């Protein structure tokens, strides 16, 4: 709530009117990609979002940069998002608009802090004028944070690798905790501090 109040004072606009994006220079897409009952990723929300963006872009004179923050499997940008945007807008990625993978690395308990103070910024896409603009934007916003520039597929995979690594760390620390319970005096908190 506090962050929202600050944003509103600084002219942050909240709206469900998608026509407003026709005047935007950057469009961040951060929608859910939950797991279906069969284990597959559900892309319905991201498909709907990029279809809407594509239709609005068709009527826009701007050349915006679209940044996809949602977690998607490798190949989704190339095989799903890009074709939808080009078809709906009638425009060409890399020429008429930029399309960049920009996965987020947020934890539920610290999402605002992680947004304000990221440990790394990943940008996936083609080396175009749009990529240069996005790199410049993030360099000014977070001057002391490493910016990794790669292709779409690698950026998408980085997000999955990061999630898997965090899950592995949690499982490992839980196993160590079980072991420590059987060793008198062993302190799992101290161990966790050392190994991260």
Where are these regions (language model features)?
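Conserved N-terminal glycine-rich FAD pyrophosphate-binding loop of Rossmann-like flavoproteins
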Residues: 1, 67, 121
